[in-house]
Amino acid sequence: MGRRTVCLAVLHVRITAAMPGKGAVGIEVANKVPQIVSMQKIIASRRFQECRYELPVAMGRTITDEVFMFDLCKTPHLLVAGATGQGKSVGLNAIITSLLYKKHPAELKFVMVDPKMVEFSSYAKLLKHYLAV
């Protein structure tokens, strides 16, 4: 354990290099009591509801408790990777859920590849409306 973590009485801190656009270094300290981030609250947030992105994706909350979103249209490539249990499926479900809440079936079509036939089974009922054919 480093001196900084002992002074802050935490097990882990993450130090980021110079923060973009600021002359500062970022220090992230985990909350002592983690909170669940509800996708329902994020979808119901004013920021998500009033968003004008072409393909809005709400991923969660920032360390300053703001809704974190991005426009999938401005993301030409997206690689989702990680070890077992790291949240890949949760992230993909957040993307799909965001799009389902903001787009009508006439505006959005999905092509879902699920080799295990488990990850996307909960979307089976939606396929007749959102499946690209």
Regions found by a protein language model. Name each.
Residues 3-7, 17-28, 36, 41, ...:
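P-loop NTPase catalytic phosphate-binding loop
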Residues 12, 35-36:
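Nucleotide-binding motor/catalytic cores of P-loop/tubulin-like NTPases across gene-expression machines
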Residues 31:
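Surface-exposed substrate-engagement region within the catalytic domains
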